[in-house]
Amino acid sequence: MLFSRPPIRSPWISAFRSASQLPLSRPRFFSISLSRYSVDMETVNTSERLSRLRELMQEHKVDVYIVPSEDSHQSEYIAPCDGRREFISGFSGSAGTAIVSLSKAALSTDGRYFNQASKQLDNNWQLLKRGVEGFPTWQEWTTEQAEGGKVVGVDPALITASGARSLSETLKKNGSTLVGVQQNLVDLVWGKDRPAPPREKVRVHPEKYAGKSFQEKISELRKELESRKSAGFIVSMLDEIAWLFNLRGSDIPYNPVFFSFATITPTTTELYVDADKLTPEVTAHLGQDVVIKPYDAIYADAKALSETRKQEAGETASKFLLSNKASWALSLSLGGEGQVEEVRSPIGDAKAVKNDVELAGMRACHIRDGAALTEYFAWLENELVNKKSTLDEVDAADKLEQIRSKHDLFVGLSFDTISSTGPNGAVIHYKPEKGSCSIIDPNAIYLCDSGAQYLDGTTDVTRTFHFGQPTELEKKAFTLVLKGVIGLDTAVFPKGTSGFALDVLARQYLWKEGLDYLHGTGHGIGSYLNVHEGPIGVGTRVQYTEVPIAPGNVISDEPGFYEDGKFGIRIENVIMAREVQTTHKFGDKPWLGFEHVTMAPIGRNLIEPSLLSDAELKWVNDYHREIWEKTHHFFENDEYTRSWLQRETQPISK
């Protein structure tokens, strides 16, 4: 599963020609026909909702109101009760910001969702295409609407402190003001129809999978706080809290997290979570080491912490650490900039470096997951080619989930399965829906991006197959993508190298043909946690320059190519950074490389061997031999799947 990349502003480059001289253009996203794009594209009439919101804005003396996508924890994925931007605008994509003035409304989103937004927004809304020349950013549009000393409002829990500070400084230049509106105005419009917050039980994540007790993790965090001379750390990111306390939840679909905050000081540990969500096992697990407090008490307690600290130490009081992703509301509760030091979270940094137990779990769960994928693709080919069955994309995705669920330690999926046939594969974040999705065409490319949550790890894998006869064009595109996968997988680099620097290794073969893909190459992956995990990754995001790749990092390796209206190709493996031995050690520093753990065959009939170097050909054959050795025993009583796996892992040659 992938992150987006900012749209490229330069003109599209004409593409290579295959042996058959058919043109392969650079991807033009989202011009796919509505009948093939499965998201419900029905326009929502927002007139009544906007009218009510504007009444509330006037009551609160606000001229412009901002509605972000995020929740109070700045989560990438949110619970239904936090879908405020979708409710007010009708746009259901995962990324975007809505801005409403007393007379206008605008929705800003990125290139993944331009088509979807244009279909879902009614005529009350203006679409701001992020990164496209001629369209203002949402901040610029907001500033323009606020000219003349107007007041801009936002729920301070839904915007980062740095984001609020930046916007406030911009608004001040034209005499306008940013204010925090404590009561969320969209919630008031939503009223009783707003989904209730989830009340799922929290569960213990055993140390045999976590690899370290939560007491050890907190002790290490306190050492970090001491080295920074900090008064404490207020934790707001849900995956960081789950990891720190060795707990998991089910409050957000596909993400095993639970709504909570935490405060860690040199002498106290407090977890803010609704007590009725804690089982006796969780209570016993936390014991006397952790004080449980009501979820909603965090803001008042943060304020009290800050006041107490100032009274005890006066002007020399040390500051509280706060993640640079934490909300403006939390920062204000702690006394604002003067009392807070915004940092990249030390918990996030520690979580990204998996311990030996977590790494072993990732290896093990990917073997089981690979066996599930092998069974699935063998089944799918048999249904489509031999039985001539009619299957739609959802039927196939459901079958994959059913197969995965048979394996040990399976908990659920790690994201919505992207099961896409033909041109649907060119839609980056395609999500098939029953009743509107496509029938799988055995004579077209099939792209499947899927993943699962297991107690011992999280998986994320993309495979692209063709169950008929691929064209020379498709084979060339697929092989260029495969060369990129191998390029990153086999990289050797000095300690201190960033994912930003490594990105070119996966793109180089497409670049040589004047081609590219408009998403990141790789993202961090949690250990039975979020499938997207920072701060590390491989791509062109500025944040990927900040933290170098380190041993124990687990990331995806997923270059792709997308021919709009025809097909999409992506190959994704999970790789783990480790120290490697080199002939020399320039600079007397460690050198790093990667270990791949994904164990699913790569579509053999899509590979054009003549485009591979001898080393790349050896990599493919070695990889397929490894898959056979590690997974064939799963099929001792399934001769068809075993034969399919044997065929798909046979050596290839030029």
Curated annotation (Swiss-Prot):
The keyword S-adenosyl-L-methionine does not apply. It comes from the Eukaryota. It is an enzyme of class 3 (hydrolase). PROSITE patterns: PROLINE_PEPTIDASE. Keywords: Aminopeptidase, Hydrolase, Manganese, Metal-binding, Metalloprotease, Protease. Mn(2+) 2 binds at D449, D460, E572. Binds 2 manganese ions per subunit. It catalyses: Release of any N-terminal amino acid, including proline, that is linked to proline, even from a dipeptide or tripeptide. Its cofactor is Mn(2+). Its EC number is 3.4.11.9. GO terms for biological process: proteolysis. GO terms for cellular component: cytoplasm. Pfam families: Creatinase_N, Creatinase_N_2, Peptidase_M24, Peptidase_M24_C. Mn(2+) 1 binds at D460, E558, E572. The keyword Ribonucleoprotein does not apply. One of its GO terms (molecular function) is metalloaminopeptidase activity. Belongs to the peptidase M24B family. Catalyzes the removal of a penultimate prolyl residue from the N-termini of peptides. This is Probable Xaa-Pro aminopeptidase P. It comes from Aspergillus oryzae (strain ATCC 42149 / RIB 40) (Yellow koji mold).
